Protein backbone atom coordinates (compact mmCIF):
# COMPACT_ATOMS: atom_id res chain seq x y z
CA UNK A 1 0.00 0.00 0.00
CA UNK A 2 1.35 3.40 -1.04
CA UNK A 3 0.10 6.19 1.20
CA UNK A 4 1.30 9.55 2.47
CA UNK A 5 -0.49 11.64 5.06
CA UNK A 6 -0.10 13.99 8.00
CA UNK A 7 -0.46 12.20 11.32
CA UNK A 8 -0.79 13.81 14.75
CA UNK A 9 1.89 12.61 17.16
CA UNK A 10 0.78 12.91 20.79
CA UNK A 11 2.96 14.25 23.56
CA UNK A 12 4.97 11.67 25.47
CA UNK A 13 5.85 9.37 22.56
CA UNK A 14 8.98 9.39 20.44
CA UNK A 15 8.39 9.66 16.71
CA UNK A 16 9.64 6.07 16.30
CA UNK A 17 7.25 4.74 18.95
CA UNK A 18 4.36 6.59 17.32
CA UNK A 19 5.29 5.18 13.91
CA UNK A 20 5.13 1.67 15.40
CA UNK A 21 1.51 2.28 16.43
CA UNK A 22 0.68 3.39 12.88
CA UNK A 23 2.33 0.30 11.38
CA UNK A 24 0.06 -1.87 13.51
CA UNK A 25 -3.00 0.25 12.77
CA UNK A 26 -2.54 0.05 9.00
CA UNK A 27 -0.97 -3.44 9.01
CA UNK A 28 1.99 -2.21 6.98
CA UNK A 29 5.60 -2.87 7.95
CA UNK A 30 7.19 -0.63 5.32
CA UNK A 31 6.71 2.83 6.81
CA UNK A 32 8.69 5.95 7.56
CA UNK A 33 8.33 9.53 8.71
CA UNK A 34 9.98 12.88 8.11
CA UNK A 35 10.58 15.78 10.48
CA UNK A 36 11.26 14.16 13.85
CA UNK A 37 9.35 15.46 16.86
CA UNK A 38 10.91 14.68 20.23
CA UNK A 39 8.69 13.16 22.97
CA UNK A 40 7.80 16.54 24.54
CA UNK A 41 6.36 17.95 21.31
CA UNK A 42 3.09 17.00 19.68
CA UNK A 43 1.61 17.71 16.29
CA UNK A 44 2.00 17.14 12.56
CA UNK A 45 4.28 14.31 11.49
CA UNK A 46 4.58 13.38 7.80
CA UNK A 47 4.15 9.61 7.46
CA UNK A 48 4.47 7.42 4.37
CA UNK A 49 3.89 3.75 3.54
CA UNK A 50 5.19 1.53 0.77
CA UNK A 51 7.11 3.08 -2.12
CA UNK A 52 6.21 6.54 -0.86
CA UNK A 53 8.82 6.19 1.90
CA UNK A 54 11.38 6.94 -0.83
CA UNK A 55 9.83 10.35 -1.55
CA UNK A 56 10.72 12.27 1.62
CA UNK A 57 13.73 14.01 0.06
CA UNK A 58 11.52 15.40 -2.71
CA UNK A 59 8.81 16.83 -0.44
CA UNK A 60 8.41 20.53 0.26
CA UNK A 61 8.57 20.53 4.05
CA UNK A 62 9.17 24.19 4.80
CA UNK A 63 8.26 26.49 6.31
CA UNK A 64 7.15 24.85 9.57
CA UNK A 65 4.63 26.47 11.91
CA UNK A 66 4.37 25.84 15.64
CA UNK A 67 2.28 26.95 18.57
CA UNK A 68 4.34 27.26 21.73
CA UNK A 69 3.74 28.33 25.31
CA UNK A 70 6.68 30.00 27.04
CA UNK A 71 6.69 29.75 30.84
CA UNK A 72 8.54 32.86 31.98
CA UNK A 73 10.79 32.77 35.04
CA UNK A 74 11.40 29.02 34.97
CA UNK A 75 14.75 27.28 34.58
CA UNK A 76 14.66 23.78 33.07
CA UNK A 77 17.67 21.76 31.94
CA UNK A 78 15.63 20.46 29.01
CA UNK A 79 13.86 23.77 28.21
CA UNK A 80 10.46 22.09 28.63
CA UNK A 81 8.16 21.09 31.49
CA UNK A 82 10.57 18.40 32.72
CA UNK A 83 13.87 18.73 34.61
CA UNK A 84 12.74 22.00 36.22
CA UNK A 85 15.35 23.33 38.67
CA UNK A 86 13.99 26.76 39.58
CA UNK A 87 10.72 28.70 39.41
CA UNK A 88 10.89 32.44 40.05
CA UNK A 89 7.99 34.80 40.58
CA UNK A 90 8.89 37.59 38.20
CA UNK A 91 7.19 40.86 37.46
CA UNK A 92 4.72 40.93 34.58
CA UNK A 93 6.11 42.38 31.36
CA UNK A 94 4.60 45.10 29.24
CA UNK A 95 3.00 43.51 26.17
CA UNK A 96 4.48 46.16 23.89
CA UNK A 97 7.98 45.24 25.13
CA UNK A 98 7.36 41.56 24.39
CA UNK A 99 6.12 42.39 20.89
CA UNK A 100 9.22 44.52 20.29
CA UNK A 101 11.50 41.58 21.11
CA UNK A 102 9.41 39.29 18.91
CA UNK A 103 9.90 41.73 16.03
CA UNK A 104 13.65 41.91 16.67
CA UNK A 105 13.96 38.12 16.45
CA UNK A 106 12.94 37.80 12.81
CA UNK A 107 15.15 36.62 9.97
CA UNK A 108 18.36 34.61 10.39
CA UNK A 109 19.21 33.67 13.99
CA UNK A 110 22.36 31.89 15.17
CA UNK A 111 21.92 29.37 17.98
CA UNK A 112 23.20 26.14 19.49
CA UNK A 113 20.69 23.26 19.48
CA UNK A 114 19.48 22.27 22.97
CA UNK A 115 20.80 19.14 24.66
CA UNK A 116 17.24 17.81 24.82
CA UNK A 117 16.60 17.82 21.08
CA UNK A 118 16.06 15.27 18.32
CA UNK A 119 19.45 16.17 16.79
CA UNK A 120 21.46 13.04 16.00
CA UNK A 121 24.96 12.62 17.45
CA UNK A 122 26.72 9.63 15.87
CA UNK A 123 23.34 8.02 15.28
CA UNK A 124 21.91 8.72 18.74
CA UNK A 125 19.34 11.40 19.53
CA UNK A 126 20.74 14.19 21.69
CA UNK A 127 17.83 13.90 24.14
CA UNK A 128 18.65 10.22 24.72
CA UNK A 129 22.22 11.17 25.67
CA UNK A 130 20.98 14.03 27.86
CA UNK A 131 18.72 11.67 29.82
CA UNK A 132 21.83 9.65 30.68
CA UNK A 133 23.66 12.78 31.82
CA UNK A 134 25.91 12.82 28.75
CA UNK A 135 26.49 16.28 27.28
CA UNK A 136 26.63 16.20 23.49
CA UNK A 137 28.96 18.44 21.51
CA UNK A 138 26.38 20.33 19.45
CA UNK A 139 27.65 22.71 16.80
CA UNK A 140 26.20 26.22 16.32
CA UNK A 141 23.49 26.44 13.67
CA UNK A 142 21.29 29.00 12.00
CA UNK A 143 17.54 29.10 11.65
CA UNK A 144 15.29 31.54 9.87
CA UNK A 145 12.23 32.97 11.58
CA UNK A 146 9.74 33.94 8.88
CA UNK A 147 7.01 35.12 11.20
CA UNK A 148 6.14 35.15 14.89
CA UNK A 149 3.12 36.58 16.66
CA UNK A 150 1.79 36.64 20.20
CA UNK A 151 -1.49 34.77 20.56
CA UNK A 152 -2.05 35.60 24.23
CA UNK A 153 -0.19 36.61 27.38
CA UNK A 154 -1.45 35.44 30.76
CA UNK A 155 1.56 35.98 33.00
CA UNK A 156 3.75 33.99 33.35
CA UNK A 157 2.56 32.16 30.21
CA UNK A 158 3.21 33.61 26.77
CA UNK A 159 1.53 31.86 23.83
CA UNK A 160 3.08 32.38 20.40
CA UNK A 161 2.70 31.09 16.86
CA UNK A 162 6.00 30.91 15.00
CA UNK A 163 6.92 29.97 11.43
CA UNK A 164 10.50 28.82 10.86
CA UNK A 165 12.88 27.09 8.47
CA UNK A 166 13.68 23.39 8.47
CA UNK A 167 16.06 22.41 11.25
CA UNK A 168 14.92 25.17 13.62
CA UNK A 169 14.54 24.45 17.33
CA UNK A 170 11.78 26.28 19.18
CA UNK A 171 13.45 25.46 22.50
CA UNK A 172 16.46 27.49 21.35
CA UNK A 173 14.21 30.35 20.23
CA UNK A 174 12.64 30.33 23.71
CA UNK A 175 16.08 30.44 25.34
CA UNK A 176 17.23 33.37 23.17
CA UNK A 177 13.97 35.22 23.78
CA UNK A 178 14.38 34.82 27.54
CA UNK A 179 17.94 36.14 27.42
CA UNK A 180 16.70 39.35 25.81
CA UNK A 181 14.30 39.73 28.74
CA UNK A 182 17.09 38.99 31.22
CA UNK A 183 15.28 35.97 32.68
CA UNK A 184 14.99 32.21 32.40
CA UNK A 185 12.12 30.66 30.47
CA UNK A 186 11.06 27.23 29.34
CA UNK A 187 8.41 25.70 27.11
CA UNK A 188 5.32 24.31 28.81
CA UNK A 189 3.85 23.12 25.50
CA UNK A 190 4.90 22.77 21.87
CA UNK A 191 2.74 21.79 18.92
CA UNK A 192 3.64 21.65 15.24
CA UNK A 193 0.55 22.68 13.30
CA UNK A 194 1.99 22.79 9.78
CA UNK A 195 4.96 21.38 7.88
CA UNK A 196 5.19 22.84 4.41
CA UNK A 197 1.69 22.31 3.03
CA UNK A 198 1.06 19.35 5.34
CA UNK A 199 -1.63 19.88 7.99
CA UNK A 200 -3.42 17.29 10.08
CA UNK A 201 -6.67 16.06 8.50
CA UNK A 202 -7.55 12.75 10.20
CA UNK A 203 -4.76 10.87 8.39
CA UNK A 204 -6.41 11.44 5.03
CA UNK A 205 -4.42 9.98 2.15
CA UNK A 206 -2.87 12.73 0.01
CA UNK A 207 -2.01 13.09 -3.66
CA UNK A 208 1.76 13.07 -3.31
CA UNK A 209 2.31 14.87 -6.62
CA UNK A 210 0.79 17.99 -5.05
CA UNK A 211 3.35 17.90 -2.25
CA UNK A 212 6.64 17.09 -3.98
CA UNK A 213 8.94 20.00 -4.72
CA UNK A 214 9.42 19.07 -8.38
CA UNK A 215 8.22 20.35 -11.72
CA UNK A 216 6.43 18.02 -14.15
CA UNK A 217 8.03 16.94 -17.41
CA UNK A 218 6.45 15.21 -20.37
CA UNK A 219 7.29 12.50 -22.88
CA UNK A 220 5.20 11.32 -25.83
CA UNK A 221 6.10 7.65 -25.55
CA UNK A 222 4.76 6.76 -22.10
CA UNK A 223 5.56 3.10 -22.73
CA UNK A 224 9.18 3.98 -21.98
CA UNK A 225 8.18 4.76 -18.40
CA UNK A 226 6.08 1.62 -18.14
CA UNK A 227 9.05 -0.48 -19.27
CA UNK A 228 11.79 1.51 -17.54
CA UNK A 229 13.48 2.06 -20.90
CA UNK A 230 16.28 4.57 -21.40
CA UNK A 231 15.07 8.13 -22.01
CA UNK A 232 16.92 10.71 -24.08
CA UNK A 233 16.77 14.44 -23.38
CA UNK A 234 15.44 15.14 -26.86
CA UNK A 235 12.33 13.08 -26.07
CA UNK A 236 11.36 15.34 -23.16
CA UNK A 237 9.48 18.62 -23.31
CA UNK A 238 11.85 20.36 -20.86
CA UNK A 239 15.63 19.98 -21.17
CA UNK A 240 16.96 22.13 -18.30
CA UNK A 241 19.08 20.33 -15.71
CA UNK A 242 17.31 19.25 -12.52
CA UNK A 243 14.82 16.77 -11.11
CA UNK A 244 11.33 16.27 -12.56
CA UNK A 245 8.40 13.93 -12.28
CA UNK A 246 6.61 12.34 -15.23
CA UNK A 247 3.25 10.67 -14.73
CA UNK A 248 1.09 8.15 -16.52
CA UNK A 249 -2.47 7.23 -15.61
CA UNK A 250 -1.41 4.75 -12.92
CA UNK A 251 2.24 5.52 -12.18
CA UNK A 252 4.80 8.27 -11.95
CA UNK A 253 8.58 8.35 -12.23
CA UNK A 254 11.17 10.82 -10.97
CA UNK A 255 14.05 11.63 -13.29
CA UNK A 256 17.17 13.74 -13.21
CA UNK A 257 18.65 15.63 -16.16
CA UNK A 258 22.36 16.39 -15.99
CA UNK A 259 24.83 17.04 -18.80
CA UNK A 260 22.22 16.02 -21.41
CA UNK A 261 21.75 12.64 -19.74
CA UNK A 262 18.50 11.40 -18.22
CA UNK A 263 18.64 9.19 -15.14
CA UNK A 264 15.80 7.51 -13.27
CA UNK A 265 15.79 8.39 -9.56
CA UNK A 266 12.57 6.46 -8.97
CA UNK A 267 10.63 4.56 -11.59
CA UNK A 268 7.06 3.33 -11.86
CA UNK A 269 5.79 4.42 -8.47
CA UNK A 270 2.14 3.44 -8.21
CA UNK A 271 -0.30 6.25 -7.47
CA UNK A 272 -2.52 5.77 -4.45
From Swiss-Prot:
Any single GO molecular-function term of the entry would be: tRNA pseudouridine(55) synthase activity
Q: Which GO terms describe its biological process?
A: mRNA pseudouridine synthesis; tRNA pseudouridine synthesis
Write out the function statement from the record: Responsible for synthesis of pseudouridine from uracil-55 in the psi GC loop of transfer RNAs.
Concerning its family, UniProt says: Belongs to the pseudouridine synthase TruB family. Type 1 subfamily.
One Pfam family recorded for the sequence: TruB_N
Name the species this protein comes from.
Campylobacter jejuni (strain RM1221)
Protein EC = 5.4.99.25
Q: Which UniProt keywords apply?
A: Isomerase, tRNA processing
**Catalytic residues?**
38
Q: What InterPro entries is this protein classified in?
A: PsdUridine_synth_cat_dom_sf, PsdUridine_synth_N, tRNA_psdUridine_synth_TruB
Gene name in the database record: truB
Q: Which reaction does it catalyse?
A: uridine(55) in tRNA = pseudouridine(55) in tRNA
Q: Which protein are we looking at?
A: tRNA pseudouridine synthase B
Q: Does the keyword Isomerase apply?
A: yes
